[in-house]
Amino acid sequence: MLFSCGSESEDVSSVNQQTILIYMPWSGSESYEGLYPNFLHNLDSIETAIVRRKGLGKTRALIFISETASTSKLYEIIYEKDACKRELLKTYTGTAYTTAEGIAEILNDTRNTAQALNYALMVGCHGVGWTYFSDWNDYPYEAKSHALRVKRNRPSDNQFERTRFFGSVEDDRWATNIETLAEGIRKSGLHLQFILFDDCYMANVEVAYELRDVTNFLIASTSEIMSIGMPYAEMWKSLNVQAPNYKSAVDAFHSFYTNYRTPCGTIAAIDCRQMDHLAAVMKQINEHYTFDESLLEKIQVLDGFNEPIFFDMGDYVAKLCTDPYLIEKFNNQLAKTVVNKANTPKIYSYLYWIPKYYDIRTFSGLTISDPSQNVVANQGKERTNWWKATHN
């Protein structure tokens, strides 16, 4: 196959097929390193996968990582002589990475360094879904106390498995709302092949809808992810290709966490190009039905908050709507939207002083916060573009 630029033609098979940006912004505080050690482990896992495959083929991989709150670096992973090395491309100072302009700059630097037919983004950080970081300033007290308690200890001193929610409500100065990320991608002019969130609570319908015009696919968890993050050594080969195999990536995640010492994890691959269609069906349902709050405790919860925020979307709609035609229409559209999903029998949460396990009896691959009575959800959900698109 040939493509042309001006009067020149070039064989597509000879050009860079894909560039992945591994984006790891600051996740701690001024005195605490947050997930930085875990990020270094993740990068080692990615490089292990690259060595196993004997290189990157016709793809390239760049890393943006914050070493402190105000110092970040852009590297390229180079494979040579059966090993990987990191070549420094640029040093950034300040915290512009929390802004749309800063995100656009990083993406533009990535494109200028490693032009490709396709671009993808892997985001490693804390995650609280679609919620607005400013709404967490004084809530929840227990989670803040937990963050302060655990940060005094090294990770190895803690007998319980940490998750990537840890610390995310401690300091909002380096937080980024999902709208800001979407706007940054939009400003860069890129449309991404996929975004993988190595963060807690990011496979929700509000996030997927917000990202629908900047990425084709979203890969994320509905629930908390262990602090070790995605099993990149196992998943990389499915994603670092011109045509990613989302089923294979989901299966690799599920296999890893099924056999992990804390065998808990959920994951979904979501086709964001279907989100407008899903919103249209949801609006039709909302026009005819109002949720019976007496059924709230019967919906599958996929988080560990004392007052839940993230409910299984399929289960919620099944309890909201009683029209067989609309239910079938919704389920058919949901199946087109969530192209692959997997879950262990239980999820794990470490938001408060003692971790808890929760049974999963049904799993659709997406969560929704419409029925939530959580303070943070109530402060923000009607501001989301998903809510505006699905409610009169």
Task: State the predicted function of each range.
Residues Y36-T59, C125, P140-N153, M275-E293:
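Solvent-exposed, charged interface segments at domain starts and junctions
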Residues S66-E87, V123-V169:
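Surface-exposed loop and adjacent secondary-structure segments within mature catalytic domains
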